[in-house]
Amino acid sequence: MLPEKLHNLPHNGKRIFYKFYDRSLRKFGSREVAVKLAVCAVRKKYTLVRGQWRARPDANDADTTSSSSSSETCTESDDSSDVPPARYAV
């Protein structure tokens, strides 16, 4: 279920992915939607730099632990062409 491009994510990045994937799959019942939402959650904390995932400088500004809903937008980055962008509410 983890997209190929995310296999070298740090441990905490993978935890974020799986947490959001599981939550989104239960809520929406779609694996495709769950992957898109989970990738967006990861992108709030990590960015891909020369093939390596790095913590974003503003990573602490994004809360990926909250269970409350807020409208956020995931934007596409140049370095993740095989990971689709998504618009979502988490």
Curated annotation (Swiss-Prot):
User: What superkingdom does the record give?
Assistant: Viruses
The ranges of region (Disordered) come to 53-90
Q: Where is the composition biased (Low complexity)?
A: 63-74
InterPro entries recorded for this chain? ChaB, ChaB_sf
- Signal peptide annotation: none
Instruction: Please report the name of this protein according to its UniProt entry.
Output: Uncharacterized 10.2 kDa protein
Which organism is the protein's source?
Orgyia pseudotsugata multicapsid polyhedrosis virus (OpMNPV)
